[in-house]
């Protein structure tokens, strides 16, 4: 990976270890969990621009040339879905707090802000550097996931150690539910008598 600062953002040139046939300029490619647009493609190498907003929400602000990253091309609708839907719109970063062996797996403990963990539930999903993982346990400022040998070998998680930073994206469903419930709460005072949800009420609230 090569890096060049550009107008408060960053231009990254990434070499993939897989064939990019079928990828075109303008396509989205997930880099360490961030959805980025390919602006140049040459063989197995592609170039992306990272905006200041993405830099502020990601580990890219501390990226170094030669760093290994996770890559995934965008899902084609109608294709097979393994794991959960990951948008590539990062919520922020976390830190590896510890790693413990557990049979054939490793338990990763991550520290993360409450603004992120509040949307997690036990046995729910979270994307760590773009990797879809199941939340084993979650507290106010930390959470844990189990990583099998294949995942550790095929991704950057196999190289992580305590203190390393990771990109995080929570399951978007929780955020939608929270916003919907907040809107319902604000609308309560304006609700027609006896719960009459009529055409006027729906139109007033954007339906």
Located regions from the model:
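Conserved loop->alpha-helix
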Residues: 1-207
